[in-house]
């Protein structure tokens, strides 16, 4: 039988994950900075997993196995986020300040709000794709969490960040077109990569500030 302590912690984490940031911050104005970081990491981790699952399901359903490697090494797999000076891994992220990482995370997050707003109209035929109507809502929720952290660290309203010179296109609803399939495949690949970056940055910040035993990742 699971001990009461771990069970309570899991239930609390799940409850916080289900709360919108406005409730978390509004209902618990004295919430610690570590709590805000813990929430942000949970939400980013959940979104990253959802992005990875959706990508794998799309790949399995629409992209022949023999074509996957070739496609991933072509221009269709280029991500606009690569045009900004974002760290590519944990070691590079360690060289950036917390505010720099938060601004980059916010930029990555906001670059997907437009394309993902109507994602559910594209993917409707599986259990994984069936969750896509909630991705936009979860992304907006993570945006609020990042802004809340920036307000805490800046002790005020976050300054406007850099704007991507290019943004992601919307997903193509014409799934019978090869061009549309390749476009959507590339977008899902970029979404997965960008969410991995965001999760990595948030985890680096949380571990750096609070030195937890679980910082190895």
Swiss-Prot record:
Name this polypeptide is given: Somatotropin
Organism, as annotated: Bos gaurus frontalis
Cysteine disulfide links: 79-190, 207-215
Keywords: Disulfide bond, Hormone, Metal-binding, Phosphoprotein, Secreted, Signal, Zinc
GO cellular component terms attached to this protein's record: extracellular space
InterPro entries documented for this protein: 4_helix_cytokine-like_core (IPR009079), Somatotropin (IPR034975), Somatotropin/Prolactin (IPR001400), Somatotropin_CS (IPR018116)
Subcellular location as annotated: Secreted
Any one GO molecular-function label of the UniProt entry: growth hormone receptor binding
Residues holding Zn(2+): 46, 199
Family: Belongs to the somatotropin/prolactin family.
Function of the molecule: Plays an important role in growth control. Its major role in stimulating body growth is to stimulate the liver and other tissues to secrete IGF1. It stimulates both the differentiation and proliferation of myoblasts. It also stimulates amino acid uptake and protein synthesis in muscle and other tissues.
UniProt main location, coarse: secreted
Leader peptide range in chain numbering: 1-26
One Pfam family this sequence matches: Hormone_1
SUPFAM superfamilies (UniProt xref): 4-helical cytokines
Xref: PANTHER family: SOMATOTROPIN (PTHR11417:SF2), SOMATOTROPIN,PROLACTIN (PTHR11417)
GO biological process: animal organ development; growth hormone receptor signaling pathway; insulin secretion; positive regulation of biosynthetic process; positive regulation of growth; positive regulation of receptor signaling pathway via JAK-STAT; response to nutrient levels
Gene that produces this protein: GH1
Residue list for modification Phosphoserine: 132
Gene3D superfamilies in the record: 1.20.1250.10
Stored CDD domains: somatotropin_like
């Amino acid at each position: 039988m699971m001990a009461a302590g771990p069970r309570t912690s899991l239930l609390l984490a799940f409850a916080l994950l289900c709360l919108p940031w406005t409730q978390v911050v509004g209902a618990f104005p004295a919430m610690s900075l570590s709590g805000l970081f813990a929430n942000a990491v949970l939400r980013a981790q959940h979104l990253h997993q959802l992005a990875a699952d959706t990508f794998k399901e799309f790949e399995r359903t629409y992209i022949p196995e023999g074509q996957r490697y070739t496609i991933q090494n072509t221009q269709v797999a280029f991500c606009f986020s690569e045009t900004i000076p974002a760290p590519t891994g944990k070691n590079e992220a360690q060289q950036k300040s917390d505010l720099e990482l938060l601004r980059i995370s916010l930029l990555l997050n906001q670059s997907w709000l437009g394309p993902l707003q109507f994602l559910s109209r594209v993917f409707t035929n599986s259990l994984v794709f069936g969750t896509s109507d909630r991705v936009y809502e979860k992304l907006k929720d993570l945006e609020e969490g990042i802004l809340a952290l920036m307000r805490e660290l800046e002790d005020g309203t976050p300054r406007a960040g850099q704007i991507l010179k290019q943004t992601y296109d919307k997903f193509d609803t014409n799934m019978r077109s090869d061009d549309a399939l390749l476009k959507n495949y590339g977008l899902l690949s970029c979404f997965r990569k960008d969410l991995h970056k965001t999760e990595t940055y948030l985890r680096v910040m949380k571990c750096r500030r609070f030195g937890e035993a679980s910082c190895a990742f």
